Amino acid sequence: MSDLLFTLHCAVRDTEALLGAIRTVFPAPIHIRAQSVRSQDYGDAGTAEKVSGELKRTTLELIVGADRMPNLLQAVKEARRDLPVRWRTTPLLDHGRIA
């Protein structure tokens, strides 16, 4: 089965809940990045974010086999989070580690 780069964008306050949910079904390393997003889409923004036009978000990335995606998405769906998440997968042609 091919490997995918799974990328998930979430509200900062939902980060820990999503990490816990993902860990229950997939033990791979998860890369966590804080992001600031300039946007006009304020559907899930806090008051300070609406005033500044800058959304604070967290990006989670991990490499997952395509066959594991249904379980991973189900865990994200069932996570105890407050706000919606955005996700995408990108096919990986090759990857590895160089020591």
What are these regions (language model features)?
Residues 1-99:
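Positively charged, small/polar-rich N-terminal and surface patches that mediate targeting and assembly
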